[in-house]
Swiss-Prot record:
Gene: L3
Assembly and oligomerization: Homodecamer; each decamer is made up of two conformers of VP2, called VP2A and VP2B. 12 homodecamers assemble to form an icosahedral capsid. Interacts with protein mu-NS; in viral inclusions.
Compositionally biased region (Polar residues): 118-149
Organism of derivation: Reovirus type 3 (strain Dearing) (T3D)
A biological process from GO: 7-methylguanosine mRNA capping
Documented EC number(s): 3.6.4.13
Protein name, as recorded: Inner capsid protein lambda-1
Keyword annotations: ATP-binding, Capsid protein, Helicase, Hydrolase, Inner capsid protein, Metal-binding, mRNA capping, mRNA processing, Nucleotide-binding, T=2 icosahedral capsid protein, Virion, Zinc, Zinc-finger
Region feature (Disordered): 1-149
Similarity-based family: Belongs to the orthoreovirus lambda-1 protein family.
Length: 1275
């Protein structure tokens, strides 16, 4: 018999008295699912299954039926299955008993129509004119007998309908029936919520995440667990302020250092002690007998040598000291530090490298004097000869020993000696403090002038350095304004005024200085990702530290939990997108790294890595590829890749191959070419630039996609940052105070921000979702997709479209502010070129630094090969990381923006070294110009510089030689300023002789912007030039002799110094009878006892005797031969040779004039040590000066100087009235001009001709507090 058709969901026992309806227990739904393989119809997104169950009539019928129930129903044992599995009373069959029961039930229902009309629900008329009734109340879910009273069953049904359990996140886990809760994973029915939770746990799902689809449940659980401890979702408020501040500055340069000692770098040293007979011992040593300290050494011979800071009292050692031994010792090491290989003689140096070594020595001299003279206070002197002058108080326990040296006029004795005679001739009142009150406004004055021992060169260097720092000094008012500007007003900065102004805070820097330093940084990066990537990582950490945005991936999972999917779907869009966004094998710091990349789009190009693109181009029919496209489309606008729009377009074009065709104008770059390959402007398809070329009929989706890109791609904007008027700006291709952004910027809400769906990135996401909905709706592209899958995909896209993420609004409002706040403090300032959006002609194709000679500055800009597809360093980012951040951003509860940023920014600006990077830029600029100045002295670079040292021999340095020299300069600068990281390293590679720096920025249309930063001037370079000019006159003080030497026998009893020989012993090229030995000269030995003949430079054969001139190079190349052939003629005095040296180090050997002395051993040893690549210090034999009569013995000299080279001699027999025998020198009054000449102005100096050894020294009482010590910040 045919089954009776049913309309109700329950079963009937066939008995008339079992007609009361019961709530549906869900088993019918299971049968429907089993019968309908295609799955149930898709409901509207967001509609829960529980709401669907509430709308069914079965439940309402139960409520109506239970209102009038007065007695329990009878037990129905006939509904129990028999041994064969047949159930009685379930179906109407051929058995007459079942038919009778059906007829009886029909009559009973007709009889009680008026009474129980609201209690019974009829079905359509079935077979044999029998109506199907609802399930009997005495039959349970499985058809067995139900012994529970009706009241109990009514309470259970009511509690199942009106649930008292708290609301759950996402979809309700079951459809409730009168008997329990059904699991949507396996359709099992549980009878209590606790049982259901335990059962769901057995599926591996968390109780509060049970969903309609088991696939979604599993992916959400995995998604949340994978993100649980990821660093990107951790709140970074626990990051220590100190660690954060370390990201903002590298080494703090040692810019300001103090010296409380004597300001002098030249030391008077005794060379030969005084030798006096016993009968005049008391007369000569009068001062020492009465313990009277002398201002000068009491010796037979005293000389001036270089010894920087020999009487200093410093707070920091720059470790650049130049210490020259007395000339009686060998100082050759000072002239062989550079460009001398290890194979050279230990006692020799290369004469062709003398100039480079002298320049390096002078640089060290300057660097070791970059101190400020510390004001140490005064005390009135009570000795009679100073007339109560205020003398400076020195720190330290040995201060007393310095007073006689500092103030020579404090000494006064009736003794007759050169020292006492000098002191007696001095101006007595030029001692101690000069013309300045010590107190100013109740405190120590800023500066004071002091008469004391000092050398004019050191005073000048320190004065210029002080002036340089004074130009950098900023007052509290400027600090207040600058910090407020840099902090974008989020930190209130005030500067209380004090009655004193003796603060030195050198933080002001010019734009030119910062630009030069910026170019050096860009050269340092080059194409090296290992240099720029840590910079971006540090900035990303800093952004995470100060940003209120929190990445909470549960926002995504909660949103996906509301997606309704059928449990029979083989594909789950929600599960697929969750799987795509898991952090496995990905660097999910890419989001904030992408933001950091906005600051450096001129030197680094952030691109989406190839793994984020659909594999092998992808297909529009693949669900996985569609989600790859969605993720990629959302992430691309946040990169700095100027080709990102066309990559977004070509990604979909790759997927549409075979479905839609677009006209491509390049045979290589076709529609099937991977989208990531379209990375240069010349690869952009013409149809993308002119979307009218895309047919809306043949390619409607791609036409729509191109229109979306052209209309909704984010628009670039800008924001103000920094304080260029005070702290300068390193911007090169943008205005000084402008920070460029690739997206639109809107003013931030200073109070509590609210969710905003009107920003650019949200609109962009919405358009991408709408495009994908058009794709899935079209059966042409998804022919195999079921309606259930399409509906699920549309629901997922709708949820993603309206996901409540704060990230888009954060990027438009707060992210620009954060970048603008940290940008002024970064060790690497922003380097940007304009963002171009979709303007292909303005796409940057080249940004590069050129180094060239100044006379070829018009050479074209760098021409990069076509294989260089990005500007600067390409940095690949994971699109999934960016998309997760875009979809899962949230703010802390009760966020007040201005309060948050005040608390977050204040610790950074409260760091004591926050702007030390500005000082580093100043040092970099100084170092660059110093290097350029020094290299110009040893090579031809067209750099306009005075060449004071051209008389010192030097090669014309090659690129490699100049690079070695530059490396030493770099090391010296880093040592002096206590820097450990890179300074001039980018200039060491290549050719340092190319002294002109320039930077070019070229666009695709061929337009080139060329920036040549102006050199603002270098104090260190100027000081080196000053020292070189002084060296040009005072070379003997530095251990160098000028001119040539003459080798020949000279025997005499006259006690003269070979450094100042008699004029009749000197000859030159213009002297009659002098022959020149040139490169083409030849020696012809005589036959049969005849004397050898030499062809001189004129070609004449002349005897080898008399006066000859040899170039040093020729002697070096033939040293062994000349030594063997010429020594006999030199020793006999028949031959005298002048070797053209130019400049040479020398060494003095003093001898007792009362005894015979012969210098041949010194001369022959020196000749033997000459090699083709080195010469030793030239030895001179000098008699000891005597203050009494002696019997002089003969002395044989073999080497004499051609010029006067005895300027380093300070005094002879200083403790005696006069010198009787030997070289005579009184204390040089010309070096004490202001002390001995009352008509000389107090501040007069005689540089560069003479180094004064007594001057007016300006000493300073400045405080050098950090910026944070003079301002008060209120967070």
């Amino acid at each position: 018999m045919k089954r009776i058709p049913r309309k109700t969901k329950g079963k009937s026992s066939g008995k008339g008295n079992d007609s009361t309806e019961r709530a549906d227990d869900g088993s019918s739904q299971l049968r429907d699912k089993q019968n309908n393989k295609a799955g149930p119809a898709t409901t509207e997104p967001g509609t829960s299954n529980r709401e669907q169950y509430k709308a069914r009539p079965g439940i309402a019928s139960v409520q109506r039926a239970t209102e009038s129930a007065e007695m329990p129903m009878k037990n129905n044992d006939e509904g129990t299955p028999d041994k064969k599995g047949n159930t009685k009373g379930d179906l109407v069959n051929e058995h007459s008993e079942a038919k009778d029961e059906a007829d009886e039930a029909t009559k009973k229902q007709a009889k009680d129509t008026d009474k129980s009309k609201a209690q019974v629900t009829y079905s359509d008329t079935g077979i044999n004119n029998a109506n199907e009734l609802s399930r009997s109340g005495n039959v349970d879910n499985e058809g067995g007998s139900n012994q529970k009273p009706m009241s109990t069953r009514i309470a259970e049904a009511t509690s199942a309908i009106v649930s008292k359990h708290p609301a759950r996140v996402g979809l309700p886990p079951t459809a409730s029936s009168g008997h329990g809760y059904q699991c949507h994973v396996c359709s099992a029915v549980l009878f209590s919520p606790l049982d259901l939770d335990a059962h769901v746990a057995s599926h591996g799902l968390h109780g509060n995440m049970t969903l309609t689809s088991s696939d979604i449940q599993r992916h959400i659980t995995e998604f949340i667990s994978s993100w649980q401890n990821h660093p990107i979702v951790q709140v970074s408020a626990d990051v220590e302020n100190k660690k954060t501040a370390q990201l903002l500055h590298a080494d703090t340069p040692r810019l300001v250092t103090w010296d409380a000692g004597l300001c002098t770098s030249f030391k008077i040293v005794p060379i030969v002690p005084a030798q006096v007979p016993q009968d005049v011992l008391a007369y000569t040593f009068f001062t020492s007998s009465y313990a009277i300290q002398s201002p000068f050494p009491e010796a037979a011979v005293s000389r001036i040598v270089v010894h920087t800071r020999w009487a200093s009292n410093v707070d920091f050692d720059r470790d650049s000291s130049v210490i020259m031994a007395p000339p009686t010792e060998n100082n050759i090491h000072l002239f062989k530090q550079l460009l001398n290989t290890e194979t050279l003689s230990v006692r020799g140096a290369n004469p062709l490298m003398f100039r480079a070594n002298v320049l390096h020595m002078l640089l060290e001299f300057v660097l070791d004097n970059l101190y400020l003279n510390r004001h140490t206070g005064f005390s009135q002197d009570h000795t009679p000869f100073t007339e109560g002058a205020n003398l400076r108080s020195l720190p330290g326990p040995d201060a007393e020993k310095w007073y006689s040296i500092m103030y020579p006029t404090r000494m006064g004795t009736p003794n007759v000696s050169k020292i006492c005679n000098f002191v007696a001739s001095c101006v007595r009142n030029r001692v101690g403090r000069f013309d300045r009150a010590q107190m100013m406004n109740g405190a120590m004055s800023e500066w004071v002038d002091v008469f004391e021992t000092s050398d004019a060169l050191t005073v000048s260097i320190r004065g210029r350095w002080m002036a340089r720092l004074a130009r950098m000094n900023i007052n509290p008012t400027e600090i207040e304004w600058a910090l407020t500007e840099c902090a974008q007003g989020y930190v209130t900065v005030t500067s209380p005024y004090a009655p004193i102004v003796n603060r030195l805070m050198p933080y002001r820097i010019s734009n030119a200085e910062r630009q030069i330093s910026q170019i050096i940084r860009i050269m340092n990066i080059g194409n090296n990702a290992t240099v720029i990537q840590p910079v971006l990582q540090d900035i990303s950490v800093l952004l995470q530290r100060i940003s209120p945005l929190q990445i909470d991936p549960t926002i995504i999972s909660n949103t996906m939990s509301t997606v309704s999917e059928s449990t029979t779907q083989t594909l789950s869009p929600a599960s697929s997108i969750l799987g795509k966004l898991r952090p496995s094998n990905s660097d999910f710091s890419s989001f904030r790294v992408a933001l950091a990349g906005w600051l450096y789009n001129g030197v680094v190009t952030t691109v989406i890595d190839d793994s984020s693109y659909p594999k092998d181009g992808g297909s529009v029919t693949s669900l996985e590829n569609l989600w790859d496209f969605f993720i990629l489309a959302l992430a691309l606008p946040l990169t700095t890749d100027p080709c990102a729009p066309v990559k977004a377009f070509m990604t979909l074009a790759n997927m549409m191959v075979g479905f839609e065709t677009i006209p491509m104008d390049n045979q290589i770059y076709t529609q099937s070419r991977r989208a990531s390959a379209f990375s240069t402007p010349h690869t952009w398809p013409r149809c993308f630039m002119n979307i009218q070329l895309i047919s809306p009929i043949d390619a409607p989706i791609l036409r729509q996609w191109a229109e979306i890109i052209h209309r909704y791609w984010p628009n670039p904007s800008q924001i103000r940052y920094g304080a260029p008027n005070v702290f300068g700006s390193a911007n090169l291709f943008t205005p000084p105070e402008v920070l460029l952004l690739p997206i639109d910027h809107q003013p931030a809400n200073v109070t509590t921000p609210t969710l905003d769906f009107t920003n650019e990135l949200t609109n962009w996401r919405a358009r991408v979702c709408e495009l994908m909905k058009n794709l899935v709706d079209n059966q042409r592209y998804q022919p195999g997709w079921t309606q259930s899958l399409v509906s699920s995909m549309r629901g997922t896209l709708d949820k993603l479209k309206l996901i409540k993420s704060m990230t888009p609004m954060y990027l438009q409002q707060l992210a620009p502010v954060e970048l603008a706040v940290i940008a002024p403090m970064l060790p690497f300032p922003p380097f940007q070129v304009p963002y171009v959006r979709l303007d292909r002609d303005r796409v940057p194709t080249m940004v590069g630094v050129t180094r060239q000679s100044r006379d070829t500055i018009t050479q074209p800009a760098l021409s990069l090969s076509t294989t260089n597809t990005t500007v600067g360093v390409p940095l690949a980012l994971d699109a999934r990381a960016i998309t997760v951040a875009l979809l899962s951003g949230k703010y802390p509860p009760d966020l007040v923006t201005n309060v948050w940023y005040a608390d977050a920014i204040y610790p950074m600006y409260a760091d004591t070294e926050v702007f030390s990077n500005l000082q580093r830029d100043m040092i970099t600029c100084e170092a660059v110009q110093t290097l350029v100045t020094l290299v110009a002295q040893i090579s031809e670079t067209q750099y306009p510089v005075d060449r004071y040292l051209d008389w010192i021999p030097s090669l014309r340095a090659s690129a490699a030689t100049a690079a070695t020299f530059a490396e030493w300069v770099n090391t010296s600068m880093k040592t002096a300023f206590d820097l450990s990281d890179m300074l001039l390293e980018p200039l060491l590679s290549g050719d340092p002789r190319m002294t002109q720096l320039a930077i070019q920025y070229q666009q695709y249309n061929g337009r080139t912007f060329n920036i040549i930063p102006e050199m603002p001037g270098s104090v260190i370079a100027d000081c080196v030039q000053l020292t070189a000019e002084v060296f040009n006159h005072e070379y003997n003080l530095f251990g160098i002799a000028r001119g040539d030497i003459i080798i020949g026998r000279v025997q005499s009893t006259h006690l003269w110094s070979p450094l100042a020989p008699p004029p009749d012993l000197v000859f030159d090229r213009d002297t009659p009878g002098v022959h020149i030995f040139g490169r083409d000269c030849r020696i012809s030995f005589g036959m049969n006892g005849a004397a050898p003949m030499i062809r001189d430079e004129t070609g004449l054969m002349v005897p080898f005797e008399g006066n000859w001139i040899f170039p040093l190079a020729l002697w070096q190349m033939n040293t062994r031969y000349f030594n063997q052939q010429f020594d006999a003629w030199i020793k006999t005095g028949e031959l005298r040779i002048r070797i053209e040296m130019g400049a040479y180090p020398y060494m003095l050997h003093y001898y007792d004039p009362r005894q015979y002395a012969n210098a041949w051993n010194l001369t022959s040893a020196w000749l033997e040590e000459i090699t083709p690549t080195s010469i030793p210090s030239v030895p001179f034999m000098v008699p000891i000066s005597s203050d009494h009569d002696i019997s002089s013995a003969p002395a044989v000299q073999y080497i004499i100087s051609t010029e006067y080279n005895d300027r380093s001699l300070f005094c002879t027999n200083s403790s005696s009235p006069q010198t009787i025998a030997g070289p005579d020198k009184h204390i040089p009054v010309e070096r004490y001009n202001i002390l001995t000449n009352p008509d000389a102005p107090p501040t007069q100096i005689q540089l560069p001709e003479v180094v004064d050894l007594y001057n007016v020294v300006t000493r300073y009482a400045y405080e050098t507090p950090p910026i944070t010590a003079v301002v008060m910040g209120v967070p």
